[in-house]
Swiss-Prot record:
It is found in: Apical cell membrane; Cell junction, Tight junction. The gene is pals1a. It comes from Danio rerio (Zebrafish). The PDZ domain is required for apical location. Residues 481-662 form the Guanylate kinase-like domain. Residues 258-338 form the PDZ domain. The lineage of its organism: Eukaryota, Metazoa, Chordata, Craniata, Vertebrata. It comes from the Eukaryota. This is Protein PALS1. Gene3D superfamilies: 1.20.1440.360, 2.30.42.10, L27 domain, P-loop containing nucleotide triphosphate hydrolases, SH3 Domains. Disruption phenotype: Morpholino knockdown embryos show disrupted epithelium organization and cell-cell junctions of the myocardium at the 16 somite stage. Loss of myocardial sheet coherence and heart cone fusion at the 20 to 28 somite stage. Reduced extension and an increase in cell density of ventricular myocardial cells resulting in defects in remodeling of myocardial cells during heart tube elongation at 36 hpf. ATP binds at residues 488-495. GO terms for molecular function: ATP binding. Belongs to the MAGUK family. Expressed in the retina and in the neural tube.
Length: 677
């Protein structure tokens, strides 16, 4: 089952500023995934074929038949060939040319594919000179001997000999054995797991190994190894289930290539096709399929035949039906694309976190809906191809084994462009407030010029178009724990959970010491209860961006600084924070690498029961406000959360919180890649 869609392009009309799909490009940009797993999509409606198209197809078939008959009449009988008779009367003596011995492939065919891709042979200048002299000696006419003499003079010139030496150097390099293939691209993760296993070892060697693996030089080495290995493993060798070959030949007066791919039943072909007039053209090669693994099918190739079945003149639905019944060896007759094919590039896999929800069934612009990859905000995507800047090919984290083909997701620039146009349309539909729309636009432009301020974080976030954030795996060191930031609406239990952790395990958890401008009281100690500072010093630190969050209470300033959090981390403890949404940007832009957990409220009735245990009797509208506030926080800041806990029961939530914190010691976590640079 498949669905056909056009590769839509967003255009802005001159009048309404809206979006439109270019109707004229429907036939040209339609794509269908052929030989896809049946659960990936639904069937498309057939394309209506006009009588004129049938007439053109018939005319082309008649012309091809006439050309074949003409070539047959022009063929000469080899037995009556005057040239062959003359050669048989005066046969030429064959000459052994040692310079060409290494150029012959296994099949001995000079026109075969293997001879074209074989590495250059190493030649000796003396052998070349000897072969030329033998050729000159065997020639009878003086003109040919003079021609060979000119070649001999050329070979003996210093410039030619330098070029000849360069040729041999390149040939020597290309004939070298390939470097060893990497076994894994997760050496850094393995080293971190080993470090955790041996850090409490009772053996001297185990402690020494733990110390060695925790050094910055070793971690940098493992990171460099994984970066190189990840690139090397991108171009993996052909798997045994995909055998392929390619030959060039003439077909109907055109130069075509014949591609044979042996495809297993569990490996989809992984290609999309589109109609271009009466032609069927390969539109996209999808990662993970037999077409991509063979490396012989390319975008822009026109399909003429598949296993002897003529394809030209058929629509994409018919092509789907033809391929649905074919297994084993698939033989394609193709007209190669006229586009110049650049050599394959070892693409680096880019890991991103999705900051928006995406459902391809609701996207009219996805070029091939059955290949669209559905994902939710917070999912990790592995981008394996960005050849098409508008539509990337990706896998969801954890689905690589269950997802045979890569899926299509919107490219970052494309997603930003169409979201910006949606916002423009919505703004244009809003009623004018003062008679001129320019007023609102000027206000918006002024916000962008405003310096980032935690107190105005909501305005700052409204200007962003959330798409993707590049991520990398990070395993926290044993002596430098990530701070835990709890966030949620009031009365959702985040403060109670924090206090329980602090009182239950004081040797493991600690809170940052806040700053204040009020006077110190008798029982208080500077640096233990508060950092007591002057109002001027507090304002200077606030202007310098040193506070995660700050506020004023009874004409005194209070604030939590990044330095206070860092002091807790330096002691080896886990710093616990309860912060507001306005503080998340400052916290994440620091070097603290926080782990942010959202504490969400349960249903309204369950929330009422939880608050009743604390002798609280909120009104129904207050409960609705808490739930609505949580929904707004998740909608506006959910892309910044690392985990979420629905607090249906405080004891269960406490155990879940402990599980998430303990997991940071044993498993690497996805963090923004900018944190590791």
């Amino acid at each position: 089952m498949t669905t056909s869609h056009m590769n839509g392009y967003v255009t802005e009309s001159d009048g309404g500023g809206g979006t439109d799909i270019v109707e004229e490009g429907v036939q040209r940009h339609r794509e269908m995934a052929v030989d896809c797993p049946s659960e990936l999509g639904a069937r498309t409606l057939p394309v209506r074929r006009s009588a004129q198209l049938e007439k053109i197809r018939q005319q082309q078939e008649d012309r091809r038949r006439r050309e074949e008959e003409g070539r047959s009449r022009q063929e000469l009988d080899l037995n009556s060939s005057m040239r062959l008779k003359k050669l048989s009367q005066n046969p030429k003596v064959g000459i052994d040319n040692p310079t060409f011995e290494q150029m012959e492939g296994p099949g001995g065919s000079a026109g075969g594919l293997q001879s074209l891709i074989a590495p250059p042979a190493l030649l000796e200048l003396e052998d070349l000179l000897m072969s030329l002299k033998q050729v000159q000696h065997s020639l009878n006419d003086s003109q040919s001997q003079e021609d060979v003499e000119l070649v001999l003079q050329l070979v003996q010139k210093p410039d030619f000999q330098k070029a000849f030496s360069i040729h041999n150097s390149v040939a020597h390099y290309m004939n070298r054995p390939s470097p060893p293939y990497p076994l894994t691209d997760h050496a850094q993760t393995l080293a971190q797991e080993v470090e955790v296993m041996v850090q409490n070892s009772s053996h001297k060697e185990g402690l020494e190994l733990s110390s060695l693996l925790s050094t910055s030089h070793m971690q940098a080495l493992m990171m460099a190894h994984d970066s190189v290995a990840e690139q090397e493993m991108q171009l993996e060798p052909l798997v045994p289930s995909v055998n392929a070959s390619e030959t060039l030949t003439q077909w109907g007066g055109e130069t075509v290539k014949i591609v044979r791919i042996e495809k297993a039943k569990d490996i989809p072909l992984g290609a999309t096709v589109r109609n271009d007039m009466d032609s069927v053209v390969i539109s996209r090669i999808v990662k993970g399929g037999a077409a991509e693994r063979s490396g012989l099918l390319h975008e822009g190739d026109e399909i003429l035949e598949i296993n002897g079945v003529e394809i030209r003149g058929k629509d994409v639905n018919e092509v789907f039906d033809i391929l649905a019944d074919m297994h084993g060896v698939l033989s394609f007759v193709l007209i190669p694309s006229a586009q110049i094919k650049s050599p394959p590039i070892k693409e680096t896999v880019v890991h991103v976190k999705a900051h928006f929800d995406y459902d391809p069934s609701d996207d009219p612009y996805v070029p091939c809906r059955e290949l669209g990859l559905c994902f939710q905000k917070g999912d990790i995507l592995h981008i394996i191809s960005q050849d098409d800047p508008n539509w990337w090919q990706a896998y969801r984290d954890g689905d690589e084994d269950n997802q045979p083909l890569a899926g299509l997701v919107p490219g970052k620039s494309f997603q930003q462009q169409r979201e910006a146009m949606k916002q423009t349309i919505e703004e244009d539909k809003e009623p004018e407030k003062t008679g001129k729309l320019w007023c609102a636009k000027k206000t918006k432009k002024k916000r962008k010029k405003m310096q980032y301020n935690a107190n105005k974080n909501d305005d700052f976030d409204n200007e962003e178009i959330l798409t993707y954030e590049e991520m990398a795996l990070y395993h926290q060191p044993a002596n430098r724990k990530r701070p835990i930031a709890l966030i949620g609406p009031p009365n959702c239990g985040q403060n109670e959970l924090r206090q329980r952790l602090l009182s239950t395990e004081p040797d493991r958890f600690a809170g940052p010491v806040p700053h204040t401008t009020r006077s110190r009281r008798d029982a208080e100690a500077n640096g233990r209860d508060y950092h007591f500072v002057s109002r001027q010093a507090f304002e200077m630190d606030s202007a310098a961006g040193k506070f995660i969050e700050s506020g004023e209470f009874e004409k005194n300033f209070y604030g939590t600084s990044t330095d206070s959090v860092r002091q807790v981390i330096n002691t080896g403890k886990i710093c616990l924070l309860c912060v507001h949404t306005q503080s998340l940007k400052v916290l994440r832009s620091s070097d603290l690498k926080p782990y942010i957990i959202f504490i969400a409220p349960p249903s309204q009735e369950r929330l009422r029961a939880l608050l009743a245990k604390d002798n609280k009797n909120p009104k129904p509208e207050e409960l609705r406000d808490i739930i609505e506030k949580a929904r707004e926080m998740e909608q506006n800041y959910g892309h910044l959360f690392d985990a979420a806990i629905v607090n249906t029961d405080l004891d269960k939530s406490y155990q879940e919180l402990l599980r998430l914190i303990n997991k940071l010691d044993t498993e690497p976590q996805w963090v923004p890649s900018s944190w590791l640079r």
